[in-house]
Amino acid sequence: MSLYLGLDSSTQSLSAILLEVDGKRRRVAFESSIVFDEAFPHYGTSHGVLPDSDPATAASPPLLWVEALDLMMTKLVESGLPLGQLAAVSGSAQQHGSVYLNAGASSALASLDPGRPLVDQIGGIFSRQVSPIWMDSSTGAECRAIAAAVGGDDTLARHTGSRAFERFTGPQIRKFATHEPEAYARTDRIHLVSSFLASLLAGRHAPIDPGDGSGMNLMDLALSTWWDAATSATAPGLRAKLPELAPASSVVGPLASYWQVKHGFPAARVVVWSGDNPCSLIGTGLVREGRLAVSLGTSDTVFGLMQEPRVDTTGTGHVFGSPTGAYMGLTCFKNGSLAREHIRDEFHLSWPEFSRILAATPPGNGGRVFLPWYEPEITPDVPTAGVHRYGLQPGDRDGHVRGVIEAQMLSMAIHSAWMGVAVDTIHATGGASANREILQVMADVFNAEVYQFEVGNSASLGAALRAAEADAESDHAPVSWEEIVHGLADPVATSRIAPNSTAAALYANMRAVYSACEAHALGRGPVPAIGNVAVGMSDD
């Protein structure tokens, strides 16, 4: 019997899943989460983020993550599980966030004292006391400068998988180097959150895997190497400050003596960590093409495995490395639950009432189209909020209920087509995935079977599964990814929702109508026509 630990350091919490593997029998033996604000109020964070007078700036204290890691390992010991059977540990972390260390970090990591709390030993290793995170949007000027230096956003996207994004690590590094040049000069190593936490476990600088490295605007996606043009355009001497890149199944080394002596852990393998999105790819069982995951949350996200890297020419999608050695595509939509809840509240509905109306309204919504951009949208790029109606009157309750869901599903299908994936199965996650009426529209629009997927933390589960896969590979007994995820990252078999062939055909034709409405709303096309008749419009 072997145990595999998966950790996930998100914006607001640190979660852990411990898998017990005994031949073909596998189960989750331990699951826990530490909410940062509750466990460590002395850092003064709100939802894991430090307060700032600039709403575009978002950062967290890296010592918070250090203290959380030490506490989680203590909780594991207190569980009473046979941790002597721990074979490997890996992790997931919020993507794009960066940690800045000085030249004293290497010796500090290698000489951790098990008699002292971890947080008390490494406070002096930071050249920057805060870590900018994915919520930061303050680097527009840096994005433009980097893109211009490498030949434009199209060139940057072809090489790195994404155009320059404010939250990505490269623009954040450029801002730091420009505004705090002396602190940047004192910086010896710039880690991602994932590689920093892996370094704490291994007691040495850990590499970055291609999955998380591709969220930096710095890595050549096809070669899995740092792209010199991007590193040079970002900051002077940056290449020497970056960790090495290594495959996702690489072993950094054994758990450092700090963990072995203080907590009694064995010399388990520390597997390279990755980002939360690549780990969630594994945790939701997306290990072959043809499957997509749709997360229906505050924001809606579509992601899936791609065997070859393809780039979204509109510049809104992302390509990351996959732990399987292939690639993953991801597209995010900001107006997710916000838009659904807005319609529910505007018409004073309960969720059961919302669902009944949705089920009773015919597919296609009688030609009525609704664009629910209550907030500036990520996909498509809508910088100014505003809703748009085509053939839909403001007081039409039923039309708005179906209109908001059809708009979201059509937008997902249209704006994820760049991935080039022939979809046969969708794993639906997130709060709204409990609504089968919404999932029926999803099945019809994508013309694919939809399954509900019940997993508390797909990122930490994916990290634990990655640890198991890397451990098998290190023992020269590799196991297929299908076998790795089977039984642990499967959707609910009885939740299958099949597409209605008539509705699927209608939505296939409706994509062009929706695209025309979207183009008009964005000022890129004429007033759309449905059945050769220009539709009436109203905007908020």
Residue ranges of model-derived segments:
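Short beta-strand elements in bilobed, periplasmic/extracellular small-molecule ligand-binding domains
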Residues: 241
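Carbohydrate-associated surface elements
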Residues: 136
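Short glycine/proline- and acidic residue-enriched helix-loop micro-motifs
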Residues: 49-59, 154-163, 498-499
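N-terminal glycine/serine-rich phosphate-binding loop of ATP-dependent small-molecule kinases
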Residues: 1-120, 260-269, 443-450, 520-532, ...
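Active-site donor-binding loop signature of nucleotide-sugar glycosyltransferases
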Residues: 34-36, 247, 499
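Active-site core segments that coordinate phosphate-bearing ligands/cofactors
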Residues: 5-7, 15-20, 83, 144-160, ...
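Short beta-strand-loop/turn "lid" adjacent to the catalytic site in phosphate-handling enzymes
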Residues: 52, 56-57, 77-132, 162-167, ...
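Glycine-rich loop(s) and the adjacent beta-strand/alpha-helix scaffold that form part
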Residues: 119-125, 141, 235, 302
